[in-house]
Amino acid sequence: MRQTKTGILLANLGTPDAPTPEAVKRYLKQFLSDRRVVDTSRLLWWPLLRGVILPLRSPRVAKLYASVWMEGGSPLMVYSRQQQQALAQRLPDMPVALGMSYGSPSLESAVDELLAEHVDHIVVLPLYPQYSCSTVGAVWDELARILARKRSIPGISFIRDYADNHDYINALANSVRASFAKHGEPDLLLLSYHGIPQRYADEGDDYPQRCRTTTRELASALGMAPEKVMMTYQSRFGREPWLMPYTDETLKMLGEKGVGHIQVMCPGFAADCLETLEEIAEQNREVFLGAGGKKYEYIPALNAAPEHIEMMASLVAAYR
């Protein structure tokens, strides 16, 4: 019997190809057109998106991307490629492809890349530690659309999330310990997760429960008292209520209350990107210090750290 050949598909959100208004507009149009992301009536949403949001937001967001752009591209792309290459070295018998839900390389190009390697089984690892319909669900939807056009489809193993995975929690804990050793233990460790509309959670998305699971497990691994660890949500968009408490408002409140030293980690981001490097490391630092805080550090994402790659390898190797 022929041995099954397994490939790995690493999936993430995506990024503009360049820090320009035109590239950002293309990216945002694709991203904000996905019903998993914005499920507003198309009759209402299309005119607002095309006539107001894209023209106004694209130039402003392009400037933000330019402030964090790296020699090899956007931070998300640079770190995602590093993850892909490191995982391929760690598992040399399993081809590894990278695909993005929006922008390039697309998920379809990643599937085609693996099929060209004659794999008959694909392990799909969305790099979102905590499941949400707007992230992991979007990967599932696009993968189904891609495979619906194939005459022959490979076996698929789909990793829903890894919010309480032991290796993931340990990697986070070691990163926090290293930051404490470098900067001193703060008054508070703030864990900031990307937000989603509260309505999505009310309708069954268990994302907030998965975030709470990671927070609980990480605090336990660190041996920190509950009052020394706080969980918030960032990056809200639009007018409807999102998961609370909001990161920026919380940091302002903490600064005003006299909390002097805070360190912030974003456990839901497998790779640093605009939302971590600009929003958290820069914008929210200014919010906290401007409200009276004294010391603020951002703890980087795991990116391509060896422990992170080992965690990925252990996750996917179970599905060989």
UniProtKB/Swiss-Prot annotation:
Compartments in which it is found: Cytoplasm
A Pfam family the protein falls into: Ferrochelatase
Entries under InterPro entries matching the protein: Ferrochelatase, Ferrochelatase_AS, Ferrochelatase_C, Ferrochelatase_N
Assigned GO CC terms: cytoplasm
Enzymatic class: lyase
Chemical reaction(s) catalysed: heme b + 2 H(+) = protoporphyrin IX + Fe(2+)
Gene Ontology MF term list: ferrochelatase activity; metal ion binding
Residues binding Fe cation, per UniProt: H194, E275
Chief localisation class: cytoplasm
Annotated EC: 4.98.1.1
Function: Catalyzes the ferrous insertion into protoporphyrin IX.
Subunit structure: Monomer.
Stated name of the protein: Ferrochelatase
Organism: Escherichia fergusonii (strain ATCC 35469 / DSM 13698 / CCUG 18766 / IAM 14443 / JCM 21226 / LMG 7866 / NBRC 102419 / NCTC 12128 / CDC 0568-73)
